[in-house]
Amino acid sequence: AYKLVLNQWLLSLFNVKRFEDLAEHLRNEALEGLDENNVHHFHHALTAQLFNLTQLPTELLLEYDQNIVRYTQRLNERRITRGEEPIVWKYFQYLTLLFTEIYLERYFSDPKTLLAGLNAQVAICNTDKLEPDQIAPFDEQAEAWPQLNKLAFWMATGSGKTLLMHANILQYQQYLEKYGRRRELNRILLLTPNEGLSQQHLREFETAAISAELFNKDGRGLFAGQAVEILDIHKLKDEMGDKTIAIDAFEGNNLVLVDEGHRGASGGEEGAWMRFRNALCEKGFSFEYSATFGQAVKGKP
């Protein structure tokens, strides 16, 4: 149910109620790519339809668009040098990145107000629900950011979630930098359900020219804290072993990326990996990506 709350809150900033109300203006494939000023056509299409947004003035949406252009150029540098196909975002990928910009800006600048906004949305969602079905609000007395430091993306297989993950890393680094917190980040960790997927991610990071390495428990590599460290979730345990790593070996301020994390967990392990994920990003942040755990939201990108 929380997924609906965040989704509905984001849509409310655009003065719409359904994702479709935004998407319908952007579906035309002719809108993919940039204009002569390096602004996404999507940006123009959105602001032409949705002007006078009090929460999202056009100049702010343009700032977010230019951030997205910058991340995309960074991810395309090596692709273009090698003569490979550059990334051109589809409308739903662009909206995902735009939503992430909006969320991260508010998370870093004013988490208390972000939490209050989400709670207002919870109250709206609860108006027509019986008590057992109501969503529990966030705790406004407790510190806000630890309640807000996890974002989950439900995306169909083949919808480019790896490309979005790469952009999300750059987005998170941009907002750490903007708010003077870059030095606080300990590690960037990518948790995968198996060794095969770890190797695949390593190759894809190489294509994007993002420093990455398979996690080595016997010593942090040369680029510790700079490189993404890729780790099979089954190697995380409570105790250190020959082939496993104790969860408390990691300090808490990490950016944690979880690819299909629950898919690698049998029933009994499910609670364990969630506990590990929470411990790893306790003082940091996590992005989670899955095609499967959002089947309740059928047919939505």
Predicted regions: what is each one?
Residues 206-241:
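Inter-Walker segment of RecA-like/P-loop motor cores
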Residues 157:
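The conserved Walker
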Residues 1-85:
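Extended, charged/polar low-complexity intrinsically disordered regions
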Residues 163-167, 179-207:
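Conserved Walker A/P-loop ATP-binding site and its immediately adjacent core
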Residues 146-148, 179-186, 224, 249-251, ...:
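Short helix-terminating capping/connector loops at secondary-structure junctions
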Residues 99-105, 162-182:
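Walker A/P-loop NTP-binding motif
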Residues 165-176, 234-301:
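Signature of the SF2 helicase/ATPase Hel1-core->accessory helical subdomain module
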Residues 47-154:
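Conserved pre-motif I regulatory segment
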